[in-house]
């Protein structure tokens, strides 16, 4: 099996902001067929993520002098190639999340997850699937005190009684004609998404080079 990753790196020296996307192929010689990934235990997937993360860290350290592992913002799994069959989207999502946790460390887990949370949530429409996703990503939570039914009921109630998140973002924009950097703060909601806001800026000659979520409010219906 071969996994292909896009590793996003951001750095700033106070005067200048730099962004880089590093492309890397990480081969896994122990897995040959897509069906082999279906029967993998959580421990085995975790070990696989650790192996991939170590490979990424070594490659970044050995390639750049100005960028370091601490500058990694997110590792995106572009594709997985096996000798036979295609791996599932669920496996790709889980592996991507675990690799980011390994690369960025436990203190940066929330930053890692926030960048893929919206797209991941869209793929898990049932309470059962979303409960499994939460269990994979949460740390230091004791699930023995709660049954799966309790978790499903709680998530079902939350999905019925709450509206989409209204978030505040800090955007670093660059004028594509002059190269001037401008920092702006915007708010998003279900009617005004971040993509639509960025699209308007792009129409006026400004491209986003960095975005950071400042806060969010989950409003009850």
UniProtKB/Swiss-Prot annotation:
Species name: Bacillus phage SP01 (Bacteriophage SP01)
Top-rank taxon: Viruses
Name the record gives this protein: Putative gene 53 protein
């Amino acid at each position: 099996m071969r996994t292909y990753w896009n590793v996003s790196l951001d750095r700033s020296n106070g005067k200048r902001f730099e962004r880089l996307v590093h492309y890397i192929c990480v081969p896994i010689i122990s897995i040959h067929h897509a069906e082999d990934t279906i029967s993998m235990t959580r421990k085995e997937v975790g070990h696989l993520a650790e192996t991939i993360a170590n490979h990424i860290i070594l490659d970044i350290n050995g390639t750049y002098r100005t960028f370091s592992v601490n500058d990694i913002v997110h590792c995106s799994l572009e594709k997985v190639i096996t000798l036979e069959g295609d791996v599932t989207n669920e496996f790709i999502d889980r592996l991507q999340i675990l690799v980011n946790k390994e690369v960025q460390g436990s203190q940066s887990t929330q930053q890692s997850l926030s960048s893929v949370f919206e797209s991941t949530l869209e793929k898990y429409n049932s309470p059962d699937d979303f409960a499994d996703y939460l269990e994979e990503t949460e740390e230091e939570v004791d699930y023995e005190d709660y049954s799966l039914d309790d978790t499903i009921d709680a998530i079902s109630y939350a999905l019925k009684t709450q509206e989409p998140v209204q978030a505040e973002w800090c955007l670093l924009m660059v004028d594509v004609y002059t190269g001037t950097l401008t920092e702006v703060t915007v708010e998003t909601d279900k009617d005004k998404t971040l993509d639509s806001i960025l699209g308007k800026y792009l129409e006026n000659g400004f491209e986003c080079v960095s975005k950071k979520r400042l806060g969010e409010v989950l409003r009850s219906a």
